[in-house]
């Protein structure tokens, strides 16, 4: 049986990171943080493209795993400072297995085409408003994720563009199986940029997407300052709810 293991990158032990880690501990999910107390060389991602260092850290970690471990684990890679986990590993794994086979990595989806708006014409048609790849969260077999990371990237280059190019232009295994699928209905990943009106809080601890009629498993406050402020307020209220028990 596959086991879920969360990997994330954080170089500083900030209050935002502690909130993310608290959410993982609440849900009792096994995890490892990459890069703590090392120098961040991935650019200022609040101001523009960057984040290639996350890919390099992830690749370096997975290359230390033996074949048996790579096959055994389903990896969920996520951002940390602007993310919280909302449910347990069983729900996450069940949803992933219902959406994908073991050859495919499921990426978070968002409403904005970033960082190159001009790539929107290459995206496949879908009924969902969440049609663009977001690299802040993805889940798949550890070996399949490592296979996605073959191409080199500089630390300061953009991680979202790296994965977007694979999805748009190099997404087939043996001309039949997709390497990457997008979480069009936010079954697992909920991005917030442009999605204020889509979500409600249910029972003070879960997010419900009214547009997709789903209960996402992770909440990601991607986007500009007003998004971060909304995410901070929302995530703090959810963490506070769990702190009562």
Locations of regions flagged by a protein language model:
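Short, aromatic/basic amphipathic alpha-helical patches
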Residues: 17-27, 120-122, 230-236
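N-terminal anchoring/stem segment of glycosyltransferases
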Residues: 1-74
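Conserved donor-nucleotide/metal-binding helix-loop-beta segment in metal-dependent transferases, i.e.
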Residues: 83-125
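Juxtamembrane luminal stem/stalk of type II transmembrane Golgi/ER carbohydrate-processing enzymes
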Residues: 1-8, 14-16, 91, 227-245
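Catalytic core and acceptor-binding pocket of nucleotide-sugar-dependent glycosyltransferases
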Residues: 130-244
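Generic preference for well-ordered alpha-helical elements
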Residues: 14-17, 52-55, 82, 86-90, ...
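A generic structural motif
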Residues: 31-40, 106-111, 179-190, 245
């Amino acid at each position: 049986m596959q086991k879920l293991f969360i990997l994330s990158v954080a170089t500083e032990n900030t209050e935002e990171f502690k909130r993310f880690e608290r959410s993982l501990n609440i849900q009792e999910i096994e995890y490892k943080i990459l890069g703590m107390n090392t120098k961040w060389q991935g650019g200022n991602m609040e101001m523009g493209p960057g984040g290639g260092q996350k890919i390099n850290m992830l690749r370096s970690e997975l290359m230390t795993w033996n074949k048996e471990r790579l096959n055994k684990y389903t990896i969920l890679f996520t951002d940390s400072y602007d993310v919280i986990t909302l449910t347990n590993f069983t729900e996450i794994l069940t949803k992933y297995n219902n959406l994908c086979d073991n050859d495919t990595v499921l990426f978070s989806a968002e409403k904005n085409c970033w960082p190159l708006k001009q790539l929107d014409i290459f995206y496949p048609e879908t009924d969902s408003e969440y049609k663009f790849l977001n690299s802040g969260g993805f889940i798949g077999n550890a070996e399949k994720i490592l296979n996605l990371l073959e191409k080199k990237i500089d630390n300061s280059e953009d991680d979202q563009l790296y994965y977007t190019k694979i999805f748009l232009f190099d997404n087939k295994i043996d001309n039949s199986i997709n390497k990457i699928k997008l979480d069009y209905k936010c079954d697992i990943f909920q991005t917030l940029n442009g999605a204020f009106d889509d979500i409600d809080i249910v029972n003070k601890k879960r997010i419900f997407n009214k547009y997709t009629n789903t209960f996402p498993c992770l909440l990601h406050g991607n986007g500009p300052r007003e998004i971060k402020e909304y995410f901070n307020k929302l995530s703090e209220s959810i963490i506070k709810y769990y702190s009562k028990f």
